[in-house]
């Protein structure tokens, strides 16, 4: 397969380098377009007011293009302009830190995969449940194998496969589970600190309270030692709320007389 590889931790991140080697070892043709600098938690940001510059990286058997931009910039620019061949799949990762539940709203890793899916490419986001991963060669090899095993044709159009690895050695992993996202949310707080020169600053911290995590969801299974697979799609529509909003729809904007509320008027907001 022809694989386009990106991430949000930067082109020199250990996770991307491990994924690159594993994909090559598995016989894939790999083309890297990744951020030059770390872009963690930038979400789906796109650069629109600055030029995008590209730097070539050739070192120790690694070849890739670094973009001075966001993960989404890398995907858009890479697939539109930089790559000579159309990839069969786009892989984003391996990210340092899990991307489960609400994380996907902030994740540059998942956003890169989502952008690829929007552009019509099969997309895989890969993350590891630790911010200080040591050797990710085992996880990368497993992900490369999974890439060839997945039935991409059977997945819905614009589906992103979100793959997360638990923070345990691969021999201790319990197995692989397909599962939904947790709906638990982060409990955030900011530490107020002082820098060495006496200046004041704030540092974000947070946790997903374990008691709020439903069993069988990605966060729960990952904590238990399972590899998790979650299909994602970009559709923020709250379909359950459509009927409520439909009550105030109608023709014109001269009041609620034409709204589909049984013809009643008055009692406005």
Swiss-Prot record:
Annotated localization: Cytoplasm
Pfam families: SurE
UniProt superkingdom: Bacteria
Cofactor binding note: Binds 1 divalent metal cation per subunit.
Record EC number: 3.1.3.5
Enzyme class, first EC level, given as a word: hydrolase
Single GO term (MF): 5'-nucleotidase activity
Chain sites annotated for binding a divalent metal cation: 8-9, 40, 95
Cofactor entry: a divalent metal cation
GO CC aspect terms: cytoplasm
Catalytic activity: a ribonucleoside 5'-phosphate + H2O = a ribonucleoside + phosphate
Function: Nucleotidase that shows phosphatase activity on nucleoside 5'-monophosphates.
Family of the protein in this entry: Belongs to the SurE nucleotidase family.
Record-linked HAMAP family: SurE
Protein name: 5'-nucleotidase SurE
